[in-house]
C-alpha cells in the first residue's frame, strides 16, 4: 500500500510541476486561449492513451507503474479544473464564442491525442 501511495504522490508532484512549467512558458503567448493549459491536457491525453494501451498489452507490469504514470503523473499534468475556470472567465466576460471555442478545442484535441497514443502503441508493438 505504501508503494502505491508513493507512486501516486511522486507522479502527481512531477505532473503538477510540468503543468506549472508549461503554464509559465506558454500562457503568455496567447492569453485568450492559455496554451499551457491546452498543452497540458493534450500531452496528458496522448500519454494516457499510450499508457492504457501499453499496460493493457503488458498486464505483468507492476500496478504501481500504472498508478505512477496514469493516476499520478498524468493526473497532475492534466487540468480540467483550470480549463473550467478559463471557460467560466470567458462566460463572465460575455465572450460566449471564446468559451465555446475553448471547449471545442480542448475536448477535440485531447480525445484525438488519446486515440493517437493508443494507435502509437498498437503500431509500435506489432
UniProtKB/Swiss-Prot annotation:
It comes from Paraburkholderia phymatum (strain DSM 17167 / CIP 108236 / LMG 21445 / STM815) (Burkholderia phymatum). Belongs to the fluoride channel Fluc/FEX (TC 1.A.43) family. One of its GO terms (biological process) is cellular detoxification of fluoride. It is a multi-pass membrane protein. This is Fluoride-specific ion channel FluC. It holds the Pfam family CRCB. It comes from the Bacteria. It is found in: Cell inner membrane. The chain crosses the membrane at residues 3-23, 35-55, 68-88, 103-123. The gene is fluC. One of its GO terms (molecular function) is metal ion binding.
